[in-house]
Amino acid sequence: RDVLGSRGLGDVYKRQGISNVGIVAKSNFQSLMDHVGSGSAYDLSKRRSNLSILPPYDGKAFSSFVETIYNMHGYIEHCREEYVLISQGNVITNIDYTDVFDFHSKKKADITLIYKNHAIPQGYDRPITLDVDDDGKVNQIFVKPGVVDKEAFNHAYGSILIKKDLLMSEIRNAISVNQLDVKRLLQSSLGKYSIYAYENKGYCATISSINDYFEFNMDLMKKEVRDELFNPQRPIYTKVRDDAPSRYGLTSNVKNSIIAQGCVINGEVENCVISKGVYVGEGAKLSNCIVMQDTKIGCNTNLNYVIIDKDVTIKDGRSLMGYDSYPIYIAKKSVV
């Protein structure tokens, strides 16, 4: 859900990566633990770096941001770093946090919010939008009751840089008066603290619905998006699975798709994102699909605008067709 990254400002010049990361998990986090593991894939399993999974205490997901931070106080206060960087887990971007720390320090800000000027995703019922002056100072914080299509707003998407002591002080005060809404908490802080906003000018996608997830994956077909996200100056690390290279049969035909290793492709694939270990049978036609790992797609199938979760079996001859604004979702381990 949320990533709490913390480090001192002095460390920011040594490296881009944050060396102490806590991931706040929801109630079912087995897949998350399997993916991040010990943190070794992200260079976070060494003596001076750490990755922690922070599950809810009673097995239930936290109901609010304020409650989440309050219940993580033991982890946060145990960290030796002076600053905390909070980031939402549903935001896809590749941002240089060194620049954010430099901005925060230069402005002598108490709180820095990171925002993107764009049309707000439809899944946000009450997004936080900002009125920012030319110097980056936040004049007003709005909680928008609805979303206006095709209009650009300064959307604060949930990334916050703040001193650890200030964060915990405000969270305790909010809990004491039962103020659990982070939007209202930020609004009440505007008169007390110096709040600045840093604009993320790169690619930024927020995933709040199946449609958002589908649109983001389709964006990966665009070279400019891939170049932005997979910037060699800020490489993205992930869990490694040692698979053989993907094999393309004589009957295969692949266009404008991203295909991971370990796949066997014998059919036609166009505008698709296909994860590791996927099998596509002869005569199968896949268009505008997202197929997750270890899925088996039978012969002579016809799939269009379909999102398929892990370990799914699509039997021979099946046809499934969604639409760009309403893709079909097939749950994990289903048999169709």
Q: Predicted segment positions?
A:
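Single conserved hydrophobic/aromatic residue that forms the stacking wall/gate
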Residues: 2-9, 13
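A structural motif
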Residues: 16-18, 269
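Short internal beta-strands
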Residues: 22-26, 114-115, 307
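Short phosphate-binding loop-to-helix
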Residues: 34, 41-80
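Short aromatic/hydrophobic "clamp" motif used to bind/position activated sugar donors
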Residues: 84
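Conserved core of the sugar-phosphate nucleotidyltransferase
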Residues: 94-165, 169
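Left-handed beta-helix
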Residues: 165, 173-336
